[in-house]
Amino acid sequence: GFVEARRYIAHDAAPRYLSLYSTKTFEVLDSPAYRAALANQTPWSKANIARFQNMIRSVARITISRGRGRGAALGLVRLRGATPDLRDRLASRFDPELHDGVIGISLLEGDPSLSRSLTNPSDDSGAGDWFILIEGTSIDAVASLTPSHFSGVLNDATVVSSGTYRLMFDLAAADL
């Protein structure tokens, strides 16, 4: 069910690496096959997951997506305490054409029931967090929108973190 995988390295962010995966449908991530794969990790997967530090795992729906393409740089703003009305307020700020070098802005809303940590399942403090992704041609372009550009509409939502990443690679479905 996976159709794309992207890997980033931090420019000015934590954690050091960021991986984004896309699926044909959101339901793939709640399917018996996916749950079985998570429950029966290979020895290689277990060894690699054990090395993860400062890991954030979020299974999220893309609820707003404006613009086209993938950028060489990514701005990321992580929000906690978001409410459904925030989605509409944020949408009014998601216009990549107004910002030089920004080619896309998306909102990803974490699903608390599917976003449990693989390394510490009892820690679900950020399972329902939302993420604003800003795709751009340069670090400077995406940094101009993180997070002050959105501060006037956040209300009670808290910015947990923000930062910038550089794209390392992008794999399409045929590559996976």
Where is each model-derived feature located?
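Short, well-ordered beta-strand segments in beta-rich or mixed alpha/beta enzyme
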Residues: 9-35, 69-80, 87, 115-146
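Short aromatic-glycine motifs in intrinsically disordered, low-complexity regions
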Residues: 44, 92-97
